[in-house]
């Protein structure tokens, strides 16, 4: 299969390309035909090839509107070499290659076109047209935006589920967000109608799953078991060919036809309810003691570094209570620490008092202990959080705005009024800050 142009692939390609051209130019006759004024003409060839590959790469075409228009102007997606000779980077590379002869040959572009044709010959991503006057991609450029391609791909990190589990999840994926015009019904399986998997377990750290539409990614996220996954992340990755997608669909249909039970991959309501209850349980809390006097909350957050907690209770004392979103994040945080200690930066006054004989860490940082919290303190904090949430809910109920009261005033001054939702959010945030105070 022909590959898309990627910057990482181009970087990896450079040494191989250089070795190839350096061996071909080791002969004196081969170097003389290039009419080069530089000492090492073979160095310019891989540089120029790499630059041309970058111009036609997905990463550049999504950002460079001028070159994208030239590529999409013709059906072949070709760009004339004479147009590329106008680019500053190409001119500087040609000047580096030809040296003094560059000024003599500047009036005639035929010599430069021949040299660029020589550079394109060994490329994996671009090629010459039949008339050898233009360059085009080996694989056609997809005219969709980069944001769309990012939204079509899901990356699964953390504890990776098995291939079997992912296949069942894709097969049992239900189109919950289907439109009225779509053939699929809300409770009917998609049957791989526009859904395919790009790769399975090729990497030891993550799995990529590609979809043809953005709503299929959301559908897959809803139908996948929440216990099997620690992190969903949209990753920029171009789609594979439709031919390969069709083959993958047929393969998956054969492998998954034996699975009937969808309870493994569907949403488990018990797990979700337990997670919501677990958000306000004792297993989500930790206590930090021996904190330097006068420390602030942001200093504690910086010391915790990874998996920052969603809540910190600290009132300028030596102890602080931190709460994570769930127990999984708490255990992950404890596992990432070799010991039960964290380092918090001391204040300037305390640092000045310390002697110079101490090490850098002992002078500028203080080691604080991580301890378990007792049940009574946890219940007290949970009650405070619930009271705060209920007060915010009451504020939301009071701030239900009647559309009749707020008539649009664009008729009078010619400007649009802010939507009701934005006015609501602004008022809720203002009231919630007052409640916290």
From Swiss-Prot:
Any one cellular-component term (Gene Ontology): telomerase holoenzyme complex
GO BP annotations, alphabetical order: telomerase catalytic core complex assembly; viral translational frameshifting
Primary location: nucleus
Chloroplast found in the keyword field: no
Protein's organism: Euplotes aediculatus (Ciliate)
Region Disordered, residue ranges: 417-437
Function in brief: RNA-binding protein required for assembly of the holoenzyme telomerase ribonucleoprotein (RNP) complex. Specifically binds telomerase RNA and promotes its assembly with catalytic subunit p123, thereby stimulating enzymatic activity and processivity of p123. Telomerase is a ribonucleoprotein enzyme essential that copies new telomeric repeats onto chromosome ends and functions to maintain cell division.
GO molecular function: telomerase RNA binding
Modification note: The mature form of the protein is a protein of 43 kDa, which is derived from a 51 kDa precursor by proteolytic cleavage.
PROSITE patterns linked to this entry: HTH_LA, XRRM
Protein name: La-related protein 7 homolog
Cited CDD domains: LAM
Keyword match Nucleus: yes
Comp. bias (Basic residues): 417-427
Family: Belongs to the LARP7 family.
SUBUNIT field: Component of the telomerase holoenzyme complex composed minimally of the catalytic subunit p123 and the telomerase RNA template component.
Localization (cell): Nucleus; Chromosome, Telomere
Domain HTH La-type RNA-binding: from-to ranges: 38-145
Keywords: Chromosome, Nucleus, RNA-binding, Telomere
Residues spanning the membrane: none
Pfam families, alphabetized: La
